[in-house]
């Protein structure tokens, strides 16, 4: 990461220092940095509108535009799109220099004007844009498979922390050489978890050097159905036999999932 970008991130962290105002979602030498800022901007009738701004700074930023997404429970989807388009237009005038704080200040000062534009007033569906896609409401469930864990104790603690931070429930399951992570929660948070899992140095390689998880696969993802159990917590569990693992899935209403995806790992 270039030094000016590192400095910009440090400054942003210092500015947005209140609880939940600032959060780094992922860092990668190849994909850049993704972070979230929670702020407010003045709308109609001098009412403050809460905004969730997600920025993706590519590795060649600020020579290129950052990726931007907008989310607000008080704005429609059309309004979110218009706000984003205006923000990107403003970003074009700031190319080649750190711009995130300038963009946040600009949207705080100009949101009311943007919302007064006729094309932003139509539609009643609330805006739920996230880092890269629109999220559906309700709980989702995903099943991940890990090839191995060399630094198991440390790895498990990291997974538990991520699950807690992202308000995800489910199971980290060990059965012989099989390692599965079953997660349940908001789909946006599940995707954030996967970004962390793939971009953070969570394990060590054969020489003991810290490394990223390169051997993870998503076996299954779907919206939670009525027959699925709602997990109340995230737990780490070890099973001595396949039938114990199968019972865990059956109790959770995931018998078909076990048959289609887990059994294939045993063969």
UniProtKB/Swiss-Prot annotation:
Isoform 1 and isoform 2 interact with UBE2I/UBC9. Isoform 1 shows a greater interaction with NFKBIA and HIF1A as compared to isoform 2. Isoform 2 interacts with NCOA2 and NR3C1. GO terms for biological process: negative regulation of NF-kappaB transcription factor activity; positive regulation of hypoxia-inducible factor-1alpha signaling pathway; positive regulation of protein sumoylation. Residues 13-15, 100-102 are annotated as: Interaction with UBE2I/UBC9. It holds the Pfam family RWD. It is found in: Nucleus; Cytoplasm. Keywords: Cytoplasm, Nucleus. The gene is RWDD3. Induction: Induced by hypoxia and heat shock. This is RWD domain-containing protein 3. Disulfide bonds: none annotated. Residues 7-114 form the RWD domain. It comes from the Eukaryota. The lineage of its organism: Eukaryota, Metazoa, Chordata, Craniata, Vertebrata. Isoform 1 and isoform 2 are expressed in glioma tumors (at protein level). Expressed in a wide number of tissues with highest expression in cerebellum, pituitary, heart, kidney, liver, stomach, pancreas, prostate and spleen. Low levels in thalamus, spinal cord, esophagus, thymus, lung and peripheral blood leukocytes. A higher level expression seen in pituitary tumors as compared to the pituitary gland. Enhancer of SUMO conjugation. Via its interaction with UBE2I/UBC9, increases SUMO conjugation to proteins by promoting the binding of E1 and E2 enzymes, thioester linkage between SUMO and UBE2I/UBC9 and transfer of SUMO to specific target proteins which include HIF1A, PIAS, NFKBIA, NR3C1 and TOP1. Isoform 1 and isoform 2 positively regulate the NF-kappa-B signaling pathway by enhancing the sumoylation of NF-kappa-B inhibitor alpha (NFKBIA), promoting its stabilization which consequently leads to an increased inhibition of NF-kappa-B transcriptional activity. InterPro entries: RWD_dom (IPR006575), RWDD3 (IPR038840), UBQ-conjugating_enzyme/RWD (IPR016135). Its main location: nucleus. One of its GO terms (cellular component) is cytoplasm. The RWD domain is required for the sumoylation enhancement activity.
């Amino acid at each position: 990461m270039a030094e000016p970008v590192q400095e910009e991130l440090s400054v942003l962290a210092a500015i947005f220092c209140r609880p939940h105002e600032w959060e780094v979602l992922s860092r990668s030498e190849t994909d850049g940095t993704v972070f979230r800022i929670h702020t407010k901007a003045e709308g109609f009738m001098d009412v403050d509108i809460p905004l969730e701004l997600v920025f993706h700074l590519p590795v060649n930023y600020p020579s290129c535009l950052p990726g931007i997404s907008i989310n607000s429970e008080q704005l429609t989807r059309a309004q979110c799109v218009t706000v984003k388009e205006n923000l990107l237009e403003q970003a074009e005038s700031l190319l080649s220099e750190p711009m995130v704080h300038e963009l946040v200040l600009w949207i705080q000062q100009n949101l009311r004007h943007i919302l007064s534009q006729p094309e932003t007033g139509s539609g009643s569906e609330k805006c739920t844009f996230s880092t890269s896609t629109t999220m559906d409401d309700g709980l989702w469930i995903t099943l991940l498979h890990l090839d191995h864990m060399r630094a198991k104790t440390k790895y498990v603690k990291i997974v538990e922390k991520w699950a807690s931070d992202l308000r995800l429930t489910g199971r980290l399951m060990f059965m012989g050489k099989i390692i599965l992570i079953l997660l349940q929660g908001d789909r946006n948070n599940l995707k954030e978890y996967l970004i962390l899992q793939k971009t953070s140095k969570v394990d060590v390689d054969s020489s003991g050097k810290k490394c990223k998880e390169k051997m993870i696969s998503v076996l299954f993802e779907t919206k939670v159905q009525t027959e699925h159990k709602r997990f109340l917590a995230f737990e780490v569990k070890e099973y001595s036999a396949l039938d114990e693992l199968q019972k865990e899935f059956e109790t959770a209403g995931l018998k078909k999932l076990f048959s289609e995806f887990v059994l294939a790992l045993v063969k």
